[in-house]
């Protein structure tokens, strides 16, 4: 069994923002804690919103902060990220043949699949929502087919499920119906892991186990009713 560590929504920022002014320090402390207490981990997964504004300087700061980690890292993108700027600073991260930052890792009994839910400029959805276009869904279907005899854990920034927090549920994966229609064609999806919500939540949705994780940077207020 692999030991996977998840860091979610680190929101490194290069601008002055009182709520994020210690973002680099918080990530540095999280990495130090990881290396002191869980250094037997196999992979560190960042579930998106690596940067707060998607600026090159923010990704440079991230590159410097993770330079002390000598084990595999999987970076994923969220709605605060910029795909082009990220790839400029992390050129070793190759997008798939459609230009999206999607990948998979195959093990004896499990496969991990990492999805790119960052909207493209031509996706006609609200700016903070997630989206999986037909190309991304077809890529996912291909990977699920390859892993037919294994359990699959899907990682994605935007949750496809609802949490009861109305304001955040409005900003989830916009075409979650298409997503669930796609994965229900297979019987090997074991767990859905997401970021975006900035809280630890787990449950069952559409028959699938799911988990979200709190932000390394700042937590979301547990508020179920959205402001009108």
List the predicted regions and their residue ranges.
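Active-site glycine-centered loops adjacent to acidic/histidine catalytic or metal-binding residues
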Residues: 9, 48-49, 78, 115, ...
